[in-house]
């Protein structure tokens, strides 16, 4: 490798590597520390999202029926994030890189998008079977691939493309293996509304991830993880306000006491279910936002889709669901897709290291 090629590779690192590997603002971290943070974020996203989905199913199975409560619990657990935020250095870089007005606009716009997204997902799950819902949710990978390419200049290599395809196929296989049917009594119009809500929610979710990555890299330009928590706290606050307004405007709040009394497992379990769901969704969201900060929005979305494959394992352990051959094949395909993306990050790191060595010579 000559000197000119080495300079080109280093230039690619400064301009584009952070979109497929580690961001430029995190170059100060040792690679070992970076990988530890990535795997911790992956663990939070997959485990917390799986627990949240299981608790959500438990809520509906035991008599819960409020769409706005289902929307609210996805974001109202943000106060727990103030505890770790107290032990992190303040994100002073955000105040110097953009104005307070810009910060407010970012938090408001993303918060409203999250609130709308959560509501649409609640409607989709209400009108669709679990299998149809999961198939439509997997479309977020395709949307995110497009948004990442145009908004974040994500390099869509063959390995990344294979990763997206493998995870999508895996999610579809798991969904097809689910023998649940549409909710009884729903009309064709309700089914159509559920499909449209779920697809539109997947589009908004993918756009939201890409816009978060764009905000971190080009607007906030923060170098601290406190900004990750602040992003999650303030956007969740806005989304929670949207859900609370909807809860009172729709009149569902008047039925909550009856719903609690008629909950099959009792009032205490009802409250614990909602609290556990709120905390789980919040931890999962922190993992998702952290992966956007550490890697990219596309990677965060890939791991989120991977959790759709891990959730059946949790259902097997909790609800004693049957592990079929199709689910086993889907799990294998999902982990292969995950491996493709990890290997792409390894190749990117190796290329940068060789370029640095060539420049040093």
From Swiss-Prot:
Topological category with respect to the lipid bilayer: Multi-pass membrane protein
Keyword tags: Membrane, Transmembrane, Transmembrane helix, Transport
Family matches, as Pfam families: PUNUT
GO function terms (MF aspect): purine nucleobase transmembrane transporter activity; purine nucleoside transmembrane transporter activity
Chief localisation class: membrane
Listed InterPro entries: PUP_plant
CC annotations in GO: membrane
UniProt similarity note: Belongs to the purine permeases (TC 2.A.7.14) family.
Name this protein carries in UniProt: Probable purine permease 13
Source species of the chain: Arabidopsis thaliana
Upper lineage: Eukaryota, Viridiplantae, Streptophyta, Embryophyta, Tracheophyta
